[in-house]
Regions:
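Mature N-terminal segment immediately following signal peptide/propeptide cleavage
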Residues: 10
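Intrinsic disorder at enzyme termini
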Residues: 1-6
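Short amphipathic alpha-helical coiled-coil/interface segments
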Residues: 14-15
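Glycine-rich flavin
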Residues: 23-116
Length: 116
């Protein structure tokens, strides 16, 4: 797939986030045998990264799946395997079914806080 300037800008933003919020901490997290998912996911949600292809009315960006692919590709810059896997579970396993099949009530209660 050929990325547009918008795809590339998203990747630059994700890589900058990785360089400042993830990679400097990976070794310490692994040494302490922790993964501060709640803290990290809140930062990622605030940056819009957890709702790239989720509906805007629930806090997502409402973009098509090609932007999610660009995001996942950028996660390859993380200096470990577990963190991108956890992010992928959140963005591509846990929330898609809720976004697609959940009632409006469930989306408001569970989807919105999990992507924002």
């Amino acid at each position: 797939m050929l990325y547009t300037q918008e795809h590339l800008e998203l990747q630059r933003s994700v890589k900058k986030f990785i360089d400042t919020e993830i990679n400097p901490h990976v070794d310490a997290w692994e040494a302490a045998e922790i993964f501060p998912a709640h803290e990290l996911f809140k930062k990622m949600g605030a940056a819009g990264f957890l709702g790239i292809n989720k509906p805007q009315e629930y806090g997502g960006m409402g973009l098509d799946y090609s932007y999610q692919l660009a995001f996942v590709e950028a996660l390859g810059d993380v200096n470990c395997g577990g963190v991108p896997m956890a992010i992928g579970v959140q963005t591509d396993m846990a929330t898609p079914a809720l976004a697609r099949f959940g009632s409006d009530e469930l989306r408001r209660e569970f989807l919105a806080p999990s992507i924002a």
